[in-house]
């Protein structure tokens, strides 16, 4: 059985191929475009909860109203790598918004995003980001109001910036 999110990811890839074809680009141009692309997969992150401190890695706790969360996973449940984390931090700095880094506690499984599913089908430099929140997937999810403004400002700056692939990663340029 094919997961619905996987079908959506495959559709995203096909749509991108159709757009390239409509613009008169061939398969080589499609792959060149992918190599220079950068994807931000936005979902929320688990904010530190003082009543359950043992469930959090002590060096990567994230807090509500603490800024955009960059999510990483040694098990590759998130798409973030060193390059995409560095680019995201540069965009946050340019946007004037704080950022924080989240990693799951080593012995507690968790995490996975649609970005990781899409990235399993097509290799694009990508980052998993979000806002810190408590009670994820419950009827009483709680997040910080400042984080909404931070994420909006990050997204605005992200879309107003041209990322240029370089030998060592990416550079940021104004559009």
Specify the residue positions occupied by each region the protein language model found:
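Conserved structured core elements
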Residues: 10-13, 82, 108, 145, ...
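Single conserved hydrophobic/aromatic residue that forms the stacking wall/gate
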Residues: 1-8, 12
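Flexible, glycine/charged-enriched surface loops at secondary-structure junctions
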Residues: 25-36, 95-106, 163-173
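Predominant activation on well-ordered alpha-helical scaffold segments within soluble catalytic domains
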Residues: 13-17, 85, 89, 115, ...
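His/Asp/Glu-rich mid-to-C-terminal helical/loop segments that flank catalytic regions of hydrolases
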Residues: 131-175
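A glycine- and small/hydrophobic-rich beta-loop-beta segment
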Residues: 10-67, 71
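Active-site-adjacent substrate-binding region
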Residues: 45-52, 56-140, 166
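Structural signal for hydrophobic packing residues in well-ordered secondary-structure cores
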Residues: 16-24, 49, 92, 96, ...
């Amino acid at each position: 059985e094919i997961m619905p999110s996987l079908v959506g990811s495959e559709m995203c890839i096909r749509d991108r191929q159709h757009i390239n074809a409509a613009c008169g680009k061939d398969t080589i141009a499609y792959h060149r475009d992918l190599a220079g692309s950068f994807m931000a997969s936005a979902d929320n992150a688990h904010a530190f909860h003082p009543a359950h401190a043992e469930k959090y890695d002590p060096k990567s706790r994230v807090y509500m109203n603490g800024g955009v969360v960059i999510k990483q996973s040694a098990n590759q449940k998130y798409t973030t790598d060193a390059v995409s984390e560095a680019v995201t931090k540069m965009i946050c700095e340019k946007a004037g918004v704080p950022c924080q880094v989240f990693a799951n506690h080593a012995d507690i499984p968790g995490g996975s995003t649609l970005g990781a599913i899409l990235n399993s089908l097509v290799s694009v430099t990508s980052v998993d980001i979000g806002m810190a929140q408590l009670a994820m997937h419950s009827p009483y999810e709680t997040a910080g109001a400042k984080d909404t403004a931070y994420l909006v400002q990050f997204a605005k700056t992200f879309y107003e910036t041209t990322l240029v692939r370089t030998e060592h990663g990416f550079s940021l340029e104004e559009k």
